């Protein structure tokens, strides 16, 4: 590593020739020289190192302009941009050399990652530049190149995972995290152990904890570092500071883990939080992981990253949000070098594992703090933080919450007076006033390069239901900046309204790739595929939507109907149960009849089948029949009225295939259900006048009569056949009389011949039981 005093020497130089002279002295160690510059940028923005944040040879404002990618500029308060600019110049000269050593590829990776961290938005050109570098590093790691130790390989993979996170490529990040975990032999899993969570808990219940898959891998606890951010207590009158585990087991002790293992755990929790809807389950899964990392009390950057991740996780929980606020405030102060008792020169020791742990720059951590303060109602305090960061978007939102939009407008107009050619300020003014002219002005000032102006204009036109114009501006915005979370969703919605379903699906696909937990996008994507006629694919997409919002009745209803359409009846039944759980569904006779009739038809087809899969098909159909019977029983038990047709298929589902002494009880239940079906159908006064209804009633009556007589003959008691015959006579006579009485008013249709045939069967049955 290049000595730290070289940074001091360079920062004090006033012309570039002197800088070139110093650089030439380190030509043999040029990659270490560039690495020192990158490390200095990290120290200035992440760990509170406040020396040499500016230089004499270039102003920070000029360095910011040189590091800008169009309108995508480094944050206004980011520090030591002079060092990053100098590193950039060297990387541009060195990256195309044919003999780059392994350490060189790693330095280039870290440079681009730091540059991207300091930019306001994800930058597509950086992603393009960094892809071949990461591919080369992947090959070097796979070959187990001697230039990298096992620890180096683990760190590099986590740094590449950090790059993937910057561009919302969570699947690729997940693969890298898993590879890094294997490299550092992290062999752990979440499991339940008995314990207590609250001060008043009398009985142990299962708590989620991190355990060793192989207990023999447990190491010896290591002492904590002296320079480490403090982990604050909750000081809650109900919750314990730590879950008290009473069961003996292979629970992970964070003090036994090395830096790579702790960093991997951080990324595992971060990936879980980023790819799942924020609910109780995600909190339960991430908390044990973060608690394990925090318990280690080692490595400043890892500890700070873990404390910020815990603050982010706890911000939505009533009993923990106070700690979330104070903890993030403490870490932000240390990152800015405020109220830090450690000597400035000693803070350089904190820079190890900054990128591997995913520690954010101080200004991003400050945004987290502002968000937590805002959620607590401390909007004025959040406003002050965002003003210092010059994050005018957030400032406008705070003024909006305070009901002081006039102050926001005054502020932005004053800034425009100072910088009249700053197109972003005109966009902010357009957001405040909702005046299209300001967006148009911003587009003109930027030579049509302002993605934010097109986005805001598109959103405003969308609100006015001018979908065609809105779509044009949203697509232009996405051409300029493809990585925008809400914009892809809105573009997909506009395309849907314009009935351009192909482009709608493309937009929603990009939306869910950037935001896997965006359940509305999953739902809309499924709807677009239905319009395309691709129902099986739409069905699978709805499954993804339900992962991220398990409580949305409309999505469950869509999933139920689509499951019926694609023949996934088991899933349709499960969805119906879920709707009943939410009290959002009564008896949908059409759906119930369709499922039941299909199962009965499939059962008949399987019985005629002679293929090798017959046994398996019978087992699957039997299982679905049992699930359907349970569903119908639940609906009946809830006193919900079923239609005669549904009662009939319910009865047929319950009917045993063979009447025997073992199945007699089930057969009697089947007969009673068929009686209910006939009574419900016969109760409709108009059925004799409607040919289709008349056919259903007579068919049910005939089936009931036949099965009644069959049961009576099986019982074979003195009175059973007489009683059954009497019931058959009473039932069939009444039905045939009503049918004959209204025959003149019944309109003949396609079922006339079939009705006549079943009437003849009924008359024959009646004759057979005549006295």
UniProtKB/Swiss-Prot annotation:
| Superkingdom of this protein's organism | Eukaryota
UniProt TPR repeat ranges: 389-415, 416-449, 451-484, 485-518, 520-552, 553-586
Question: What GO cellular component entries does it have?
Answer: cytoplasm
Q: In which tissues is it expressed?
A: Expressed in the spermatheca.
Tell me which Gene Ontology terms the entry assigns under biological process: cell differentiation
**Coiled-coil spans in chain:** none
Tell where it localizes: Cytoplasm
Keywords, in A-Z order: Cytoplasm, Differentiation, Repeat, TPR repeat
**Broad class of where this protein is predominantly found:** cytoplasm
**Knockout consequence?**
High level of lethality with a significant reduction in seam cell number. RNAi-mediated knockdown results in defects linked to cell fate determination including impaired hypodermal differentiation, fewer seam cells, possibly due to a change in cell fate, a molting defect in 10% of animals and male tail abnormalities, including reduced sensory ray number. The germline exhibits a mog (masculinization of the germline) phenotype with increased sperm numbers and largely absent oocytes in the gonad.
> Which protein family is it in?
Belongs to the TTC27 family.
Q: What does this protein do?
A: Developmental protein required for cell fate determination in both the germline and seam cells of the developing epidermis. Specifically, involved in sex determination and may function in parallel or downstream of other sex determination factors, including tra-2 and fem-3, to promote oogenesis in its role in the regulation of the switch from spermatogenesis to oogenesis in the gonads. Also implicated in the mitosis to meiosis switch in distal tip cells.
Identify this protein by name.
Tetratricopeptide repeat-containing protein trd-1
The species this protein was found in: Caenorhabditis elegans
Please spell out the taxonomic lineage of the organism that makes this protein. Answer: Eukaryota, Metazoa, Ecdysozoa, Nematoda, Chromadorea
Gene encoding the protein: trd-1
């Amino acid at each position: 590593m290049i000595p730290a005093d070289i940074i001091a020497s360079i920062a004090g130089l006033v012309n570039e020739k002197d800088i070139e002279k110093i650089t030439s002295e380190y030509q043999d160690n040029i990659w270490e020289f560039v690495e020192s510059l990158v490390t200095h940028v990290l120290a200035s923005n992440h760990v509170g190192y406040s020396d040499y944040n500016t230089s004499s040879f270039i102003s920070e404002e000029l360095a910011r302009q040189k590091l800008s990618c169009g309108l995508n500029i480094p944050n206004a308060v980011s520090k030591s941009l002079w060092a990053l600019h100098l590193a950039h110049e060297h990387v541009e000269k060195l990256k195309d050399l044919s003999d780059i050593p392994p350490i060189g590829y790693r330095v280039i990776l870290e440079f681009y990652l730091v540059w991207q961290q300091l930019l306001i938005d994800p930058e597509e050109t950086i992603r393009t530049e960094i892809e071949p570098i990461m591919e080369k590093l992947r090959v070097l790691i796979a070959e187990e190149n001697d230039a990298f130790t096992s620890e180096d390989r683990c760190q590099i993979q986590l740094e590449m995972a950090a790059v993937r996170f910057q561009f919302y490529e969570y699947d690729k990040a997940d693969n890298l995290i898993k590879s890094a975990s294997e490299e550092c032999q992290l062999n752990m899993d979440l499991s339940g152990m008995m314990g207590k969570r609250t001060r008043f808990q009398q009985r142990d219940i299962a708590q989620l904890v991190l355990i060793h898959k192989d207990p023999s891998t447990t190491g010896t606890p290591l002492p904590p570092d002296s320079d480490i951010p403090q982990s604050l207590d909750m000081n809650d009158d109900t919750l314990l500071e730590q879950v008290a585990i009473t069961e003996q087991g292979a629970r992970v002790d964070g003090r036994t883990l090395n830096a790579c293992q702790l960093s991997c755990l951080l990324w595992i929790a971060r990936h879980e939080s980023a790819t799942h809807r924020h609910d109780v389950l995600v909190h339960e899964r991430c908390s044990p992981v973060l608690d394990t990392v925090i318990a280690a009390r080692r490595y400043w950057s890892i500890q700070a990253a873990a404390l910020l991740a815990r603050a982010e996780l706890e911000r939505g929980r009533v009993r923990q949000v106070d700690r979330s606020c104070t903890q993030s405030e403490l870490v932000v102060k240390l990152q800015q070098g405020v109220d830090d008792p450690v000597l400035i020169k000693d803070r350089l020791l904190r820079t190890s594992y900054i990128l591997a742990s995913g520690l954010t720059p101080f200004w991003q951590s400050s945004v987290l703090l502002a968000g937590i303060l805002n959620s607590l109602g401390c909007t004025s305090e959040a406003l002050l933080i965002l003003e210092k960061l010059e994050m005018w978007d957030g400032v406008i939102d705070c003024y909006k919450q305070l009901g002081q939009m006039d102050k926001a407008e005054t502020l932005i107009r004053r800034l425009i007076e100072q910088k009249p050619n700053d197109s972003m300020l005109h966009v902010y003014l357009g957001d405040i006033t909702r005046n299209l002219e300001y967006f148009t002005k911003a587009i003109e000032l930027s030579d049509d390069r302002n993605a934010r102006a097109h986005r805001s204009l598109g959103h405003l036109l969308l609100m006015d239901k001018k979908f065609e114009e809105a779509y044009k501006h949203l697509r232009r915005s996405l051409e300029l900046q493809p990585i925008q979370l809400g914009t892809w969703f809105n573009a997909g919605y506009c395309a849907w309204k314009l009935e351009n379903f192909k482009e709608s699906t493309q937009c929603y696909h990009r939306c869910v790739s950037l935001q896997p937990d965006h359940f509305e996008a999953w739902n809309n994507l499924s709807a677009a595929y239905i319009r395309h006629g691709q129902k099986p694919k739409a069905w699978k997409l709805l499954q993804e939507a339900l992962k991220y919002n398990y409580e949305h009745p409309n999505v469950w209803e869509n999933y139920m109907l689509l499951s019926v359409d694609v023949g996934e009846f088991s899933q349709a039944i499960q969805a119906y149960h879920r709707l009943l759980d939410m009290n959002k569904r009564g008896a949908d006779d059409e759906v119930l009849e369709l499922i039941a009739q299909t199962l009965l038809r499939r059962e008949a087809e399987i019985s005629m089948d002679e293929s090798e899969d017959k046994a398996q098909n019978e087992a699957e159909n039997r299982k679905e029949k049992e699930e359907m019977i349970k569903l119908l029983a639940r609906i009946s038990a809830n006193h919900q009225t079923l239609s005669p047709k549904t009662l009939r298929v319910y009865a047929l589902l319950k009917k045993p295939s063979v009447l025997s002494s073992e199945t007699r009880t089930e057969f009697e239940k089947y007969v009673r259900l068929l009686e209910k079906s006939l009574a419900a159908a016969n109760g409709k006064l108009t059925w004799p006048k409607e040919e289709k209804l008349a056919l259903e009633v007579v068919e049910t009556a005939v089936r009931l009569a036949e099965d009644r007589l069959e049961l009576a003959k099986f019982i074979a008691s003195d009175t059973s056949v007489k009683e059954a015959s009497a019931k058959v006579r009473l039932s069939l006579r009444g039905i045939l009389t009503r049918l004959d009485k209204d025959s003149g008013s019944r309109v003949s249709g396609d079922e006339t011949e079939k009705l006549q045939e079943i009437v003849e069967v009924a008359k024959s049955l009646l004759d057979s039981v005549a006295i």
